Amino acid sequence: MTRELEGRVALVTGAGRNIGAAIARDLAAGGAAVVVNARSNAAEAGAVAEAIRAGGGRAAVALGDVADPAAAEAMVRAATDAFGRLDILVNNAAIRREVAFEEMDFAAWRAVLDVCLDGAFHVTRAALAALKASGSATIVNIGGLTGHTGAPHRAHVVTAKAGLAGLTRALAHDLAGSGITVNLVAPGMIDTARGPGGSATPHAPGHRAGRRTLVGREGTAEEVAAAVRFLCGPGARYVTGQSIHVNGGAFLGG
């Protein structure tokens, strides 16, 4: 396995479990030093960091709520204090709740947007100076299939994920002269309970949420992480402003 990210430093938000943890581990496998963020669960974040160190990598933990601008600044400082620079930002922190729109109050709406959309704004703003100093930095926002297709009972999540796609394109323009590429990965139909290779038993199209995967199975967190790692590597320096769908073709299904 190549270590194409050797010498790079990454901050991954919401990295204590599931897709975020898989991203942190894969970036570390590529040679990056990784700062593992979680809102408050030190045990989960610490376990991810320890697994990275056990594999010969470098890792640090930075707890903090991305919805808090001061916490966002603190986690960026933790990265630069620990490793001296910041080259990669993965905005993965999210909360996903289902509620019918007619039952959704503003507090529920705001809670999701505060983390999923505003959180990406806060951390990106806090990281901008360090990323510009890198000279060849990367921002990867983790969106979602529903941000492009819509879904019932998730108006707040759909809106936040669609907003992330828009933010990605806007930042690709705004940061074009600074050596920073900005892309989005849109996972869908991911079974975080399974490892590489997806479901052991292929499912029929239309298995979940009324939406099929063309490859006949659910994906894994590791497959999402592989797309993120590619976008952070030297082979993707000509890629910016893009949404990469990691959903087995579900984006094309119906």
Annotate each PLM feature.
Residues 144:
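Residue(s) in the substrate-gating loop at a strand-loop-helix junction
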Residues 149, 189, 229, 240-254:
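Short C-terminal tail/terminal secondary-structure segment
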Residues 176, 181, 239-241:
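Short, small/polar-rich loop/turn modules that mediate ligand/substrate recognition or access, typified
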Residues 124, 160, 168:
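Active-site helix of classical SDR
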Residues 9, 16-18:
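Conserved glycine-rich cofactor-binding loop
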Residues 129, 173-174, 237:
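Alpha-helical segment proximal to the catalytic Tyr-Lys
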Residues 100-101, 108-113, 209:
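Substrate-binding pocket helix/loop in short-chain dehydrogenase/reductase
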